[in-house]
Amino acid sequence: MIVKNLVLENYRNHTNTRILFSDRFNIFYGDNGQGKTNILEAIYLCASGRSHRTSRDSELIKFGCENFSIAVHVSKTGGLDKDIEISYYENQKKQIKINDIPIKKIGALMGNLYAVLFSPEDLFIVKQGPTERRRFVDITLSQIKPSYFYNLQQMSKILKQRNTLLKNISSNPKLMDTVDIWNMRLAEVAAAIIKARRTFSIMLSGMAENQHNFLTGKSEKISFDYRCSFQISGQDDTEQIEKLYLVQLEKSMQRDIVLGYTTVGPHRDDYDIMINDKSLKLYGSQGQQRSAVLSLKIAEIELVKKATNQYPVLLLDDVMSELDKNRQKYLMDSIKEVQTFITCTNKEHFGNLLSANSNFFKIVGGNIHSCM
């Protein structure tokens, strides 16, 4: 999968930016605050339907303007090319078109462009709480399996309804009669989410282990293990998981009523990232954590390729300066077949790491100052 070109209008600090890309490496360099990351963000937006930096589309509009637009042309291996357009007018709903055909739901965007983002903030996957690890998995799964994204949306809506119900039961006990309906709806989508997460984590863990063996010379063993918020076995199918979850919802009912929210379910899941069977978060050094995230990200690329028969595009946002020379070389050797977009402050930083098929773009104040 290749992004052939990008057009930005009134996006962040870009007024009218048009770029033709190399099929391999595209390096955007310049001082901080010039608009390099905005280019990667726009590509990511076309893959996922949302920014990785803000949940407010209004923040993407160039100051003093009323709207923004993004357009990319995507070429798929053995498939039809796709033109993706995203536009937003202030105080209106975001508009998305694929090959000039408007789509009403973001879920329909999934699968038209696969993108893996790697930034220094990805250390949060290790360092911070379950939300960051769930987000990491959910973003990738949503791209390769649009039905998963739909189930996440449904679960969010159902949880909101169920939680409202729980908060009002004490003042209106008759509402208890409707709880079972919401439990069944929740259990149905939750079971599908849980099964997908379990399968994904098994695949990712195996691929990350292989990558980590190369990176560390087999001196460390990494694992990425799914931890469901209630007990399931590896053999449980979707129907069995649904039944188990219904039992858990019944058991936690009184506690949920007291607290006013649903205390068990996929929204409370976590993943254990281990090095040599020890928690990476608790016991891993900074270097071990960086190596683990690097292995996970390369595994993510391989997993997307295995699931879709397409390499995703890779967005490296100010990552190279965070890696030592050995990790830099390992990363670049691992992505030779992947179209890659890189931001940095100094293009000389790469030395001989890049192939001849590389384009350099200097970004100054949202403008492409030079292209070599």
Swiss-Prot record:
CC terms in the record's Gene Ontology section: cytoplasm
Gene Ontology terms, MF aspect: ATP binding; single-stranded DNA binding
Keywords: ATP-binding, Cytoplasm, DNA damage, DNA repair, DNA replication, DNA-binding, Nucleotide-binding, SOS response
Stated role: The RecF protein is involved in DNA metabolism; it is required for DNA replication and normal SOS inducibility. RecF binds preferentially to single-stranded, linear DNA. It also seems to bind ATP.
The keyword Calcium belongs to this UniProt entry's keyword annotation: no
GO biological processes: DNA replication; DNA synthesis involved in DNA repair; double-strand break repair; SOS response
Family the entry assigns: Belongs to the RecF family.
Highest taxon of source: Bacteria
Pfam families listed in its UniProt record: SMC_N (PF02463)
Name of the protein described by the UniProt record: DNA replication and repair protein RecF
Protein residues bound to ATP: G30, D31, N32, G33, Q34, G35, K36, T37
Record's subcellular location: Cytoplasm
Keyword Nucleotide-binding: yes
InterPro entries in the record: DNA-binding_RecF, DNA-binding_RecF_CS, P-loop_NTPase, RecF/RecN/SMC_N, RecF_2
Coiled-coil regions listed: none
